[in-house]
Amino acid sequence: WPGPTFTDSGGFQVLSLGAGFRKVLAMDVDRVQADDIIAEGKQRLAHVDDDGVTFTSHLDGSTHRFTPEVSMGIQHQIGADIIFAFDELTTLVNTRGYQEQSVARTHAWAQRCLDEHRRLTEAQPDRPRQALFGVVQGAQYEDLRRQAARGLETIVDAQGRGFDGYGIGGALEKQNLATIVGWCIDELPEGKPRHLLGISEPDDLFAAIAAGADTFDCVSPSRVARNAAVYSASGRFNITGAKYRRDFT
C-alpha cells in the first residue's frame, strides 16, 4: 500500500469494552434506550477519570491503564502517517452535563497528546514525522460541537505548532449527520484536512462529503464483506442468495 496510513487513538476500542456500550454507538437514538447502550458500573470493563482510562481485559481479567501519553507512545511505535489524539467517546444518551464534562476532558487530553507527540518526535529526529489530528466531540449539541472545534484550534505545543488536521468523532444522529458535521466544519480551518471517524454507509458518505468532510474510516465495510454482503448503486444485498449464484455481473 503506497498511500497514507492512519491509526486511531484507542479511545473507541477501550471505551467500547465497558464505559460502556452494550450494543452499539447508536446513530438512531429514537430506537434505543439508555440501558441498551450504557452498562451499569459493575458491568463496565472501563472506567474514565480526568487522567485517563483504567480497563479490565475481557480476555484474562488483567488491569491496564491508558492515558493520552500511552496512546501517543503506541501510535508512534506503530508508525502510521496520521495519528489521532486520545479522546473520550460518548453516546447520544449520555446526559448534557456529562457531555460538557467530556468535551472539557477531551480538550485537556488533546493538549497532553500534542505535548507528548512533540517530545516523541524530537526524540527520534531521523524518523518521518507523523501528522497528529485533534478530535472534535460534543455529541448532538451544536454549542458543544462548535466549542470543541474552536478549542482545538487554540491548542499548540511548546513550539507553537498546532494540530495537523482534525477528526470529527463521537456518536452522530443519522438523520442529522450532515448538520452536525457542518457545525464542526464551520469552526475548523479550511487549510487543514477534516476526517470523519466511524462512518461508512454510502448515503452517510455522500451527506458528509457535501458537508465538508475529506476522509473517513470505519470497520463496517470489512464486516459487511465478511458476512457476504456488498453495496451497490441500488443498495446492499447478500451475494449468497440463490438468485446470485450464477450472477457474475
Which residues are covered by each model-predicted region?
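Non-catalytic, usually N-terminal nucleic-acid engagement modules in DNA/RNA processing proteins
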Residues: W1-D126, R245
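Glycine-rich phosphate/ribose-binding loops and adjacent secondary-structure elements
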Residues: A104-H107, E116, L120-A123, R127-T249
